[in-house]
Design a protein with these regions (language model features):
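Flexible "arm" and connector segments at domain edges
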Residues: 1-48, 52-97
Length: 97
């Protein structure tokens, strides 16, 4: 009952929020220093692992091959953001012209 697709997606987002919380109210420099701090690095690893494990459960429950999905998404992005138009730009694909 607790591993419904909906509950897994909610849990995945809650774990992502915990990852985000590690950076809350910190400067970019403080965030970049997290991996050098043993306690914070462990917290970062734990949150990343929680997210990965839940993502795997979501994908399994939904019948998604994550490798194939990632490859397909990269191909879509190549079409949306062609290098010759998008390189060095923060523009959304609809604004690249």
């Amino acid at each position: 009952q607790f591993h419904s697709l909906r509950n897994l997606i909610v849990s995945l987002n809650l774990e992502a929020a915990e990852l985000l919380e590690l950076t809350q109210w910190k400067s970019d420099a403080e965030v970049e220093a997290i991996p050098a701090d043993p306690k914070l690095a462990e917290d970062l690893r734990d949150e990343c692992a929680d997210i990965l494990l839940l993502l795997l459960l979501v994908a399994e429950k939904a019948g998604i091959d994550l490798i194939a999905a990632a490859q397909a998404k990269l191909r879509k992005n190549e079409h949306k953001y062609p290098v010759e138009k998008a390189y060095g730009s923060r523009a959304k694909y609809t604004e690249l012209g």
